[in-house]
Amino acid sequence: MRSPLVAICLLFPAVVVRAATPGVSMAAVPGGSYRAVTVKASEPTREVAPFLMDRTPVTNEAFLGFVRAHPAWQKDRVSRLLADQRYLGQWAGPLALGPEAPPQAPVVGVSWFAAGAFCADRGARLPSEAEWELAAAASPKDRDGRRDPAWRQTVLDWYARPNPTRLPDVGQDAPNYWGIHDLHGLVWEWVSDFGASMLVGKEARLCGGGALGAADPLDYPAFLRAAFRSSLEGRTTTTNLGFRCVEDAAGRSP
């Protein structure tokens, strides 16, 4: 069976926000070109089709509703092939959030398999790395803020801070150019093809040299994210790793 690791310019300035899935607010991100941070500048970019992205990460409350409807994903029932022993470790119980997992805080301790199942149940999917990075390149004022030293430093400062013991609610920061919150400064997030940008053939590109392997050294935050994703397995869960869903702009995801 294929490993999850392997299985893995903007065109229009207008921002459109709609709830493609009932009760879920999503922002429209125009298509564009994306170059993986570890890919040489001489290599072609990837074209990304327009898509809809959740404005905030999935919350504890939303994921609680999912595991209630699908008991196989409850923390005391989930297969260890699909999630490690830390799965939903902040929750007080299989169907209880508790003080370390506020309802409107982002759900963490969720594996790639569980995150994908949640999105699929909604008629959505996990974003690709290209989609996520394209959306995350936007600052509050610019659709590509990566050349803004002040904004880039703000993002880097978050990566240097220790993880809080209790995560705040989602949506508390200023939205970016597309109306999306929390792409930086709250939690790391799963993508569908995690680790793919750190692979060349069958060899993983290890990141001991920091940003020296990056196609664009100024985009060091993206390199950090790619390095982090490359260390994961599909069943991995951590206390600072959550997710959000996307849908195809032309219609609901299959």
What do these predicted ranges mean?
Residues 28-29, 93-230, 234-239:
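Functional-site microenvironments in short loops/helix caps that host divalent-cation chemistry
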